[in-house]
Each structure stands twice: as structure tokens, then as C-alpha cells.
Amino acid sequence: MKPSGEDQAALAAGPWEECFQAAVQLALRAGQIIRKALTEEKRVSTKTSAADLVTETDHLVEDLIISELRERFPSHRFIAEEAAASGAKCVLTHSPTWIIDPIDGTCNFVHRFPTVAVSIGFAVRQELEFGVIYHCTEERLYTGRRGRGAFCNGQRLRVSGETDLSKALVLTEIGPKRDPATLKLFLSNMERLLHAKAHGVRVIGSSTLALCHLASGAADAYYQFGLHCWDLAAATVIIREAGGIVIDTSGGPLDLMACRVVAASTREMAMLIAQALQTINYGRDDEK
């Protein structure tokens, strides 16, 4: 018996098509909420440090995304930033798992600096299947699906292909720790790359959007200690599908729970940066 036309369409779309479409629609809905809230007064709290901020909109958006997905996919698991901050464990099992950052760039959001995003990643059997990132203020929808390419508003993304660090624009983020030892290491790593004649090192306040800039070819590399799995999951798929590389700062394979990453347009670039970095210890997401 041949599959029906509807069945053939579903097979062509892939086994997680419904999940992907749900992620896109929820990212767009969340973006509308964030755009409206950006200009309004906010109730701001701190989490692990004075620089680690959370607002009522973070909670509202996360609750919206999880409640909608849980209703549609009741057997799926969830890892989300604010739930983790409230004590939920970050465990990546073989079950279908949603990895969610409701507002990446909360400090930007608090200050009405318009570089903020919603990030929704999806993994099955501990392998990332797709990522959806929505730049709320510029209305740019970044998507990546394993084996099917990466796109921004329907336009295919490609990394720059740069291999020479002396011709590279490198992006990073500071991370939430502000103690003297951590700041010294952060500034030392930046100094090492500048001594290596990188064109520049930029901090934009949103790791997910920085990684999307890498995927689009607007930057050549990214590194960070202290980012979490919800910052990285969706962007990893997008970068890989745009032809880039995402690895651990040791130079080994990416460990999504290790709170550290080097991403680059080429493996040569990634290894050059990994070799230059001093490690800043942030622990692991699955041990907190």
C-alpha cells in the first residue's frame, strides 16, 4: 500500500515538522510580547549576581512557551532558563527535549537596548534537531534544521569561511560573574585575541544573536565561558547548518552542558581561538 499524499508530505517535511512549526509560531508570539514590554516599566530582580537579571516578562514568555508546548506534546521534556533558576534540574535525556531561553539579552531588555531574542532549541536522543531564534525588535527569524540548512526570514545563511584570525571579527559575552579573578581572565582572553591581530572583539549583550551574526557571515568567530545550554542549543543548529563549527573551548567536541563554547566559520579559526583561551570555570548546567 502506497502512502497517501498527506503521508508523503509529512515524510518529506521530516518527523519533527509539527514541533518546528510550533516553535516558529511561539517565537513570533513571544516576540510580540517582548516588543511591547520593551518600552514599558519593568520589575527587575537579580539571580546569581547583580548583573544576572530577570523580569516579569522573562517568566511570562517562558510560561507561555512551555504551557503551549506541553499541551501539544505532553510526553516531551523541558529545560528552560527561569525554571532552572528556580531549582529545576537541567537533564538532557534521550526523550524529545525543548531547550528555551525566553529572553536572551535580559540586561539589554531592562535598559531598552534593542538587541533581544527568543531562543527555542529541540533535541532528540541528545542530538539537536532544530533551532529557532527570533530577533524581536528587528523581526528577524533565524532557523536551522539538521540536514536542511539555516535561514533568516527565508534567506539561506552561510558563514564567512574565514580562516585567518588576523582578518577576523570575533564576538563574545562577559557572563554573569563579576569577581576580580573572573574579570581578569575575561580581559586577558580578549587581550590575547587582540595581540593576535584580530580585527576586533565585540560584545553585544545577546549570545544567541551574536551566534546568529556568525551564522550569517557578519562575524567570523565567537567564544564564551559562562553561557548556558539554553543560550547555545538553538544557535548551534543554525551555525552548523550555515557551514560553521561549534566546539568545546578545549578543542574537543561540543558539550552542551559545559557552559563554554568556541564557534567559528571554519575549524581552523575555531582551533586558533581555543588554543589562545584561558579557562574560566563556571561549572556545568547538569550539576547545578
Curated annotation (Swiss-Prot):
Keyword Metal-binding appears in the UniProt entry? yes
> Does the record's keyword annotation contain Cell membrane?
no
Q: List where in the cell it is found.
A: Cytoplasm
Q: Which residues bind substrate?
A: 81, 103-106, 205-207, 224, 231
Listed PANTHER family: INOSITOL MONOPHOSPHATASE, INOSITOL MONOPHOSPHATASE 2
Q: Report the function annotation for this chain.
A: Phosphatase that can use myo-inositol monophosphates, myo-inositol 1,4-diphosphate, scyllo-inositol-1,4-diphosphate, glucose-1-phosphate, beta-glycerophosphate and 2'-AMP as substrates in vitro. It is likely that IMPA2 has an as yet unidentified in vivo substrate(s). Has been implicated as the pharmacological target for lithium (Li(+)) action in brain.
| Record-given protein name | Inositol monophosphatase 2
Which species is this UniProt entry from? Homo sapiens
